UniProtKB/Swiss-Prot annotation:
Up-regulated by KIN10 under a phosphorylation-dependent manner. Gene3D superfamilies: 1.20.5.170. One of its GO terms (biological process) is cellular response to starvation. This is Basic leucine zipper 63. The keyword Zinc does not apply. Changing S160A: Normal DNA-binding. The lineage of its organism: Eukaryota, Viridiplantae, Streptophyta, Embryophyta, Tracheophyta. Residues 179-193 are annotated as: Leucine-zipper. Belongs to the bZIP family. Changing S300A: Reduces activity. Abolishes the formation of the BZIP2-BZIP63 heterodimer.
Length: 314
């Protein structure tokens, strides 16, 4: 509820009389206050129908005679009037009304004065009731209806830019999530490959150690073979490859004797035949001796290998 106060009502000429103030001269602030009240009342008459605000005017007390107290009283009245005008104009004045009133010089002065008073007294802005405030939807609707085509295009362009930026952010987020999953998979594969590499290197190290051990064993076996050969030479005094030669000769001579025994028992064999058979037996023995030389070597080698194996087992 708003009510426009006239200068007579606020100054108190209509409702009360100032005791002993007729003789006082009015200062510049009083004249400015009266001028502001006149301009605000003229602007209120030109505007729309107004409703009374919640400010109730009570019968003012007697105005003090002291000039300083009188100035303080006028200042409080001025603050009340400025608050009422600010509430009215902040609620009902549209941009069209302000553009229409900009042509009037007096209206501009009153608006500037009201703005200055509202800036000087920010505590009066809290007196605006919630019923006088417009909701966000109503303000947006009024803004859309009052916007010109260029503003509409600019708003549409801004909305399209925001939507494209939102889509690009979503695409980037999806791409980053995909890259993170790939990185996690690659890390798992890398860990598996590193584990396999460590296993292979451990196996290689074990194999190399075993190879060195086997080579050392081979060298020791060769040294043992040489020592065994030298020991055999010292004990026998000759090459061990020919120490079984008398046995081989005896085994070779046995078939010749067995082959000659039937010739001696038969009564039909003559002396020249016996001589010729004796010569043939000697030739056979010589051939068998030459043939068995290689056999003796093989047997001696086998015997030596057996002895080396027995020494190695020990």
């Amino acid at each position: 509820m708003e009510k426009v106060f006239s200068d007579e009502e606020i100054s108190g000429n209509h409702h009360w009389s100032v005791n002993g103030m007729t003789s006082l001269n009015r200062s510049a602030s009083e004249w400015a206050f009266n001028r502001f009240i006149q301009e605000s009342s003229a602007a209120a008459d030109d505007g729309e129908s107004t409703t009374a605000c919640g400010v109730s005017v009570s019968s003012p007390p007697n105005v003090p005679v002291d000039s300083e107290e009188y100035r303080a009283f006028l200042k409080s009245k001025l603050n009340l009037a400025c608050a009422a005008v600010a509430m009215k104009r902040g609620t009902f004045i549209k941009p069209q009304d302000t553009s229409g009133r900009s042509d009037n010089g007096g209206a501009n002065e009153s608006e500037q004065a009201s703005l200055a008073s509202s800036k000087a007294t920010p505590m009066m802005s809290s007196a605006i009731t919630s019923g006088s405030e417009l909701s966000g939807d109503e303000e947006e609707a009024d803004g859309e209806t009052n916007m010109n085509p260029t503003n509409v295009k600019r708003v549409k362009r801004m909305l399209s830019n925001r939507e494209s930026a939102r889509r690009s952010r979503r695409r980037k987020q999806a791409h980053l999530s995909e890259l993170e999953t790939q990185v996690s998979q690659l890390r798992v594969e890398n860990s598996k490959l590193m584990k396999g590499l460590t296993d292979v290197t451990q196996t290689f190290n074990d194999a190399s150690v075993e190879n060195r051990v086997l080579k050392a064993n081979i060298e020791t076996l060769r040294a043992k073979v040489k020592m065994a050969e030298e020991t055999v030479k010292r004990l026998t005094g000759f090459n061990p490859m020919f120490h079984n030669m008398p046995q081989i000769v005896s085994t070779v001579s046995l078939p010749s004797e067995t082959s000659n025994s039937p010739d001696t028992t038969s009564s039909q064999v003559t002396t020249p035949e016996i001589i010729s058979s004796g010569n043939k037996g000697k030739a056979l023995i010589g051939c068998k001796m030459n043939r068995t030389a290689s056999m003796r070597r093989v047997e001696s080698l086998e015997h030596l290998q057996k002895r080396i194996r027995s020494v190695g087992d020990q």
